[in-house]
Structure formats: structure tokens, C-alpha cells
């Protein structure tokens, strides 16, 4: 785990509070056969309103039986005296479908606790929710709900806990400010509420100035929205408030806490990533918050005086991107500090030696500054005996590489520095190391064989000068992400990767690996990204008689190698994820590493999209589905099964020796944005069906043997002519070459124009011969106005 128990308690305080609220309001099931018939009917009707993908062991409603006591059903609790349902907790139950306004749920009038979190309700939250007048706890987190938050929630006078986070609720409408006012008015009516979480929605507007009227409020989270205006100082006047999370909004300055008359109980405050700039906030403004243990002011221009002090129990401090130019000296006295993030500032020089003597320090992120070394001896960091996470990436550190705490270190990030020489063998002594990122340095030599002692989940050595054969024994079977791209590795791809059943990301691009296609990788059930680009792989990319099936692959890049052979027509049949939005288990694919925040380390892949090289990072991995086999020696027909991959966004098969026709099945790729079939030997015509691909922005058919007219569709006609050049038989726009039918029609039209021209010219000549000059002038003027032809203008200029 990343933090000690005290920091974990601080970071997860809102979840702890949530548990307390839920347990406080919980009523245990007692005697059997207490369920009233109308209650059972309402529950059974509610169950039947939703679809549940089968089979799902976590779907509680699938275990309900109509011939049993409903008070014994999973997720249901009844009042032991009356038999009415008072609690319904069906979170993570795979319920699919809208929550209807006439749902049987709303007949459960005695319901006090309703938890439907992490289901796929997908619709609006109906006003009928306000009919559950006795409701104390309402949790609809992550339910795919959207639209306005119903004002009827203000009728729930007993409500103490409201969690609508991670949905798509908005303040939009004909009167968005009016909608927001109704929302805030509704919140202010909840006089008993102790917990409000509206985080990660799409709400906007300003908070009311009289927030202190929520006198019992203990937790208020509206992070990840678009609220604006100033943060009302009345929030800090609520003596019961423990958690206040306003981060990732559009709040602006000035920021004031106000005069706090009674001791503050606030323990967690996050106002980071707002729009206070260019306003400067003095860090000392937080000094009166004596109970504060978690403070995140990331993204705010801070003034940190030499005499500033924060409450001594501060354990979590987020100072990311605060325009700090000097290492904050007040941290020296923060003996309880466990989590420190001062990344993305403007700090230069050496990291102070005293930092590593803070006894509780677990997480340090000093990345994206201009540090060039460490004060003290080579083993200075080993003074931080409890250090779990160290991020020193994107600085100008150079040799020697620091010695690290042997026992505690879990995650090490040191990319984008100036370290050189061999990778230090002292890293092999870090028994608990799980993530190692040394990308974008100048390391050279081979991989230390002692890596076999490590149990890594993530190994990124990208863009160094490492060489030699990658040792088989250095591959941890725990690996989930492996990136050694842009080095000088040679030999074969390590076969020990076959033992990495959890691997999702595999990138060996731009090395000198000389091997046949690793078809055995299809046995890795979680592989999503495979990049073999720019190596010396050779031979066919399939084995005769075997069907290749990369069921979860979303990025397949084997370009710029020496692969050969013909692809069978069914080559892409087993590529399930590229054929569908969901994977074979019906789950949305997301790139994750078990137990690891995926934002902790940088993953990147260089892709060719629309003819340009781009770097794919972050969320791009969950969006892009790409196939690139360009720059090889593949031949024969393009497999017809390519049409099954309807989710593919980028498809490049250029610079091969493909023959035959362009398969019409390509028109099934409804999400395709970029198509490159250039530099092959394709013949026949360009299928007109491709013009129906509304997202297709870029295509290249050049340097083939295509013929016939270019389809006259908007998607194709808007392409540059270079996308069709070097196809001798192609004709029509955007090429200058006219098609045969067009040339014949044009010639006939020109002949008709010439005949008409000759007739009119004969008439003019006769008129000139018989009519005096004045009449001739009038006649010419009349014809000029009537016909306005270019040739006639030339004749007029001749006579004048």
C-alpha cells in the first residue's frame, strides 16, 4: 500500500464517514417471515424492471426467490416489529435500465436507506424519489444518471446522507442559473443533512453565501464539477464540518476563510485545481484550521513566507503547480508529514538533506522541477526508512544514482533525467519494489541479471541506450506493463513473457529484436496493447491451421519489420474487443494495474494517425483501437474479416505487397477515422460504400493499381489529390484526369456550343453587310445584353 494507516485514514475519511452513516442507520433483520405481501410485491416488481446480464454472482436480485421471506433476501432489511422494508442496499448488482417515475420502488414508503450505487440505471432521476419521505440515506453513486437533480429531494426532511457522485447531472436547461438556484435551495432545505457528495458531475454556477445554515454538515464534496465564483467563507463557519472537497472546479478569488469564532474541526480541505490565478493566496491563511490533516491547494499561486507555519498534525500536503521557486523550509517542522507533492513548480538546486529525516514520510513527489542533485552523502535518501513512493522524474538529476531505502521502497519514478552508465545493481536490493520507471535517460549496457530478484508489476526502460539480449530471468511473472521501446536490445523476444498472465501493455518498439512473430502472446488473456514496431521481426504472422485470437487487444502495431506471407480471410475473427465496445465478459475495458493508481506512471505509444506521428498517452489507451501492419512484406488479399473490426479508429496496411481488390467489408468500420492502403498492388475500384463512413477524415490509396472513377461522396472528394496519385487507371475529382464518360460528354457539349456559335456569327456578318453602322452598333449591343458570351466580347473588342 502507498501510505501508512494514519494517512490512509485521512485520505479515505469520507469513505469512513460514509460507513459510519450507513451503519448508524442500519436496522438488522430479525425474525423470519415478517415480510408483508405488499412489500414483497413491490420488491419483486422492482427486480423485474431491470435487466441483469447472466450469469453474475454479484447480482443480488438474482438470488431472490418469490416463495421465500423477502426480509431474508440479499440487500433487504425489514423492521423487526412491523415487517416493512426499511433498507435496500443493491450496490454492484449489475442492474441495467432506467429508474422509472412509476417504479415499484416508490411504493416502499417506509424506506429509510436506499443504496443503488455502481449500477447502470442510465437515465434521469425521477421526481418520484421525493415520495420516500422517511429516507435518511440515499446513495446513487456511479449510476450513469443524467439531467437535473430533482428539487423534490428537498422534501426529504429526514435525509442525513446524500451521495450522487460520479454521474452526469447538470445545471443545464432553459434557465441554467434558475436550475442551480433550485439545486442550492433544495440543499439548504435539508436541515438534518450531515453528508453531501455531488462530486464528479457536470454541475455549474455559484454556491450561496449562507452555507452555514447547514449547521449539521460534516462532509461536503462537490469536486470535479464547474462551480464558479468565490468560495463562500460561511462554509468554514460550520463547526461540525470535517471534510470539504471543492477541488477541480472553476472557483476564483479572492479566497477567504473568515473569522472562525469556534475551534474548527475541519480535517480534510481540498481547493486545488481551480482558477484562483492570478490571485496569490498566502499559505498562512490556513493556520487557524488547527485540526487540519489533509490540505491540497494544487494549482494555486502561493505565497510562502519564511515564518509561515501550518497545524502540526498535517499529514497530506498537495502543492503541485503552485508557482513555488524555493523548497518550502516550513516543511522541516512537519514531523507528521506522510504525503508531499511539490511537483510541477520552479524549484532549482539540490533537494535538502533534512527532508529525508521526517520520520513519517511515505510519499514524495518532486517531479517536473529543476533539481540537479541531493544534499548530503550518497545514501542520504536511505534516511527515509518508511519511504514507499519516490518520484524524481523530469528534473536534471545526473550521476550518481541515489541509494534508496532497501526495505520500504515500492514505487520508483526517475524518468526524464540525465542519469547515465549502467543501471545500478543496488536497485535489485529493493525487495518490495513493484514499479520501476527509468525511461528517457542515458542508461547503457545490459539489464542486470539480478533483476530476477525483483517482483515488478511495471517495468519501463523506454528511450535509453540499453543493449544486449534481454535476460529471460529478468521478466517478473507479475508484470502488467512492460515498455523497453527505443533502445538497442537484440536477440529474441523473451519467451518468459508467456508467464505474465496479467500483462496488459507490451511495447518493444524501435529496437533490434530479431525473431519470428510471437503468436504465443495470444495466450495472454489480458493483453491489450502490443507494439513491435521498427524491429527485425520476420516471417509469417500466423501459423497454418491455427486461428490467431487476440480477444482483448486494442492496439496492434507490428509496422516496419520484415513480416511476410498471406493473411487468411478469417485472420481477424477472434479479435473481440476491436469488434465491440465491450469485451468478451461484457465489461468496458479499462487499462488498470491492480492496487496501483494508473496516474502514477507514464505510458506512451507512438502511432501513425492520418499520416502524422502522434504520441498516445493517458486516457487515449481506453479510446483508441488501432491496427498498423505497414512497412512489411505481406501479400495476397486483404482479409475480408477486417470488416468485423467495427470499433477500429486507425487502420494502416500501407507499404506491403497486398493484391486483389479493396474489400467492401471495410465499410463496416463505422468508427474509422484514418485509413492508409497506399504503396501496395491493389487493383479494381475504390468501393463507393467507404463514403458512408461519416468519421473517416483521412485516407490514402496512392501508389497502387486502382482504376475507375473515384466515388463522388463527400468523405472521399474532400481528400487531397495526393491520396489517389500513382494509380494510372483512376480518374475523376480530386484528380485532374477526367473519366472517359466525362470526356465524351464534354466533347459533345463543346460541339453543340461551336455549332451555336457559328450560327450566331453568320447572322452577325449578314447584319453588318446590310445595315448601316449605327444599326450595326445597336444590334451588337442588343446581342451583347441578351447573350453575354465570352466569345462575343472578343468580337466586340475586335470591331472597336
UniProtKB/Swiss-Prot annotation:
GO terms for cellular component: plasma membrane. It is found in: Cell membrane. The chain crosses the membrane at residues 760-780. InterPro entries: Leu-rich_rpt, Leu-rich_rpt_typical-subtyp, LRR_dom_sf, LRR_N_plant-typ, LRRC69/RLP. Glycans are attached at residues 66, 102, 155, 210, 259, 323, 333, 365, 442, 465, 499, 514, 668, 700. Keywords: Cell membrane, Glycoprotein, Leucine-rich repeat, Membrane, Receptor, Repeat, Signal, Transmembrane, Transmembrane helix. Disulfide bonds: none annotated. LRR repeats lie at residues 109-131, 133-156, 157-179, 190-213, 214-238, 240-262, 263-288, 294-311, 312-334, 335-358, 360-383, 385-406, 407-430, 431-453, 455-477, 479-500, 502-523, 524-550, 551-574, 621-645, 646-669, 670-693, 695-718. Residues 781-800 are cytoplasmic. It is a single-pass type I membrane protein. Residues 32-759 are extracellular. Its main location: membrane. Residues 1-31 form the signal peptide. Belongs to the RLP family. This is Receptor-like protein 47. It comes from Arabidopsis thaliana (Mouse-ear cress).
